[in-house]
Amino acid sequence: RQRQMCIRDRYKMIIKNVIVYTEDKKFTAGGIVVHDDKIESIYTTENVPDMPGEEVVDGQGAYAIPGLIDLHFHGCMGDDFCDNSKEAIENIAKYEASVGVTTIAPATMTLPVEELEDILRTAAEYKKEQNPKGADLVGVNMEGPFISPVKKGAQDERNIMPCDTDICQRFLDASE
């Protein structure tokens, strides 16, 4: 049985009766103090904070873990990162956030250099305008074009090439 809780924009609240992951890398009974939609502190049943007047939510024994990081995926819910649209990135980021992923670095395929530059530009523009309700776009996982044809997997061999510092610079410039 899986339970999901959605923390809406709130000034301060306590989520009690959850299983928290502690600094000593153990799961234990406790709770979470949330302030301005961010985790302010985590407590165990031995050190329950006294915060009268704050909103209290009963987690009903659910596990509460840090947000997950998705570093290698190409898309979801019918959207692909290589669709090269801010709408696709937004849909992907919102979906990822809805399943506990707070940080994303979606992957490209090995495409022509010009297409990759466009995708990187779109991602950079999205990052500047990013909707705070979706997972945070922190980078792009580029699967080429500088890969070995021997280990190409599903990548299009026509777009594979030796590393080229000028093209690397073009990718960096497009990402700004």
Locations of regions flagged by a protein language model:
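Histidine-rich, glycine-flanked metal-binding segment
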Residues: Y11-M13, V20-I65
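Short, small-residue-biased leader/transition segments that mark boundaries at the very start
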Residues: R1-I7
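Metal-coordinating catalytic core of metallo-dependent amide/deamination hydrolases
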Residues: R121-E176
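Short amphipathic alpha-helices and their capping/turn segments at secondary-structure boundaries
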Residues: P49-G61, I119-G134
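Divalent metal-dependent hydrolysis catalytic cores, especially in the metallo-beta-lactamase
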Residues: H74, E90-I119, A135-S148, S175-E176
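Short, charged beta->alpha transition segments
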Residues: M5, I89-K94, D166-F171
